[in-house]
Every structure is written in structure tokens, then in C-alpha cells.
Amino acid sequence: MNNAEQVKVWDPLVRIFHWSLVAAFAVAYFSSEDEWLGLHSVAGYIVLALVLFRLVWGFVGPRHARFSDFLYRPSVVMQYLKQVLSFRAPRYIGHNPAGGAMIVALLASLLITTVFGLAVYGAEEGAGPLAAALAGVSKSRAHALEEIHEFFANFTVVLIFAHVAGVVLESLLHRENLVRAMFTGYKRAGE
């Protein structure tokens, strides 16, 4: 495929965000034991910073990075999923309706995970930006915060598996390597 047949879709900041988030979440998830708390906390702060960046970039970034380019009504998302299941889904240059919904779900789940992570860090370790607000919280409440944090971390993993499955399915359906596109920024031009 030559450059004349390709179109730039993913800007460098979206690509750096995506792969940095993959790495930071993996480090945070797999360093969740007490002996790795320092690494877990740093990775969690990085995840939070990346999510906050992406929320801003969703309003001020280039066309395909903007939420306005890929947020659809739930009925449109459901119709698109039906088309995927019948192998008749149209191809999108940017995010398709299901991909847009997944981005919102992932960002929301990651934001909840990190905010509750900060709460756990403050309540159990007396550290972080919420330490003063959560000083003296009972062990049962601290445990509840930790349960919520862990639930959303695990829910995020479920979303990640669904996201990867969607990327593989779309890649096969449209004969296009979407993983490569997230590295290079380029996709095949419209048909």
C-alpha cells in the first residue's frame, strides 16, 4: 500500500496516550500487592494523568480525537453491533459507534478506578491528595473503598478484552490491521 492510498487518522498524541495507557494500566494491575505499593501508586497516577489528558484532548484535539467525531446515540451503537454480527457493518475511518462507546466506558471505568485508588491510598496509607480528607476513616470504610477500586480495575480488564476482541473482529471484517494503524496513525483511505 502506498501513501496515496492512506489517510492520517490517529494523531501522535492519541497514539502515545493509547500505548502509554496500555503500559501504565498493566503495571498498575500487576503490581497491586502490598510489596509493590510504590510502583502501583506511580502507575495509577500515570493512568489518572493520561485519562485526564484524553478527556481534554477529546474536546480540543484534531477531528478523529474529538468526542464529537465518535459519540453516537445508543440506538446507533446497537444498530452497528447488529450489523457487525451479520458481517454487514460499514467501515469508519475514525472510531465506529461501538468503538466510541468503548472509549467512553474505558475512560469512565479508569477514572473511577483511579479516584477510588486515591481514596484507598489516603485512607489506608495516609498518603496522596485525599489523605487529609480521609484521615480517621474506619477500617470497614477503607475496605469498602478498596473493594470498589478492585471491582472497577477488574471491570476495566473485562472492557479491555472486549476492546481487543472488537479490534480483531473489525480488522478481519474490513481486512485492515487496526493495531498497526494505532502505531503508524494511518488507515486505508475511504472506499
What are these regions (language model features)?
Residues 1-191:
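Membrane-embedded alpha-helical bundles that constitute the cytochrome b-like, heme-associated redox core
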